[in-house]
Amino acid sequence: MVSVKYVPSDMLINYVSGKLKEEKKIKEPNWVKFVKTGVSKEKPPLQDDWIYVRAASMLRKLYINGYLGISRMSSEYGGKVDRGSKRYHAASGSRSITRFLFHELESAGLVQKTQKGRSLSPQGMSLLDNASKEIIKQLAQKDPLYEKFI
């Protein structure tokens, strides 16, 4: 069985975000084009489909970490605040975006609420496992080193 940990993260996130966009599991709100993703950012993201990429990245983080709450998940997407010549100061990402995506992923059946935070549901696990299988098959066609994972 191929685990998400053995698949290159950029390929997995792009594949899963394409699946989420294609199956319309997440409703794209109106504010997506205008919102910043955190206090440390000056402008909104340049990608048009960044909300799907963020959702796929959140699913991958939940797969690897087991469970995460809104606060810890938003700190994963933080950065450093531009304070001029003053020292570095860490800032977390937008909690409202994280909360919105958790609600959307819960309504799609990919994430479930637990006592310790949010975790992947069996549907979410199977989505990521199937995606990693497909990616490993594609990589095995290009490079024979990946055939041992099939």
From Swiss-Prot:
Any GO molecular function: RNA binding
Q: Does the keyword Cell division apply?
A: no
Question: What Gene Ontology terms describe where this protein resides (cellular component)?
Answer: cytosolic small ribosomal subunit
InterPro entries listed in its UniProt record: Ribosomal_eS19, Ribosomal_eS19_archaeal, WH-like_DNA-bd_sf, WH_DNA-bd_sf
Q: Which biological processes are named by the entry's GO terms?
A: ribosomal small subunit assembly; translation
Known HAMAP family for this protein? Ribosomal_eS19 (MF_01474)
Q: How does it assemble?
A: Part of the 30S ribosomal subunit.
The family assignment reads: Belongs to the eukaryotic ribosomal protein eS19 family.
Q: What does this protein do?
A: May be involved in maturation of the 30S ribosomal subunit.
Protein name (record): Small ribosomal subunit protein eS19
Native source organism of the sequence: Thermoplasma volcanium (strain ATCC 51530 / DSM 4299 / JCM 9571 / NBRC 15438 / GSS1)
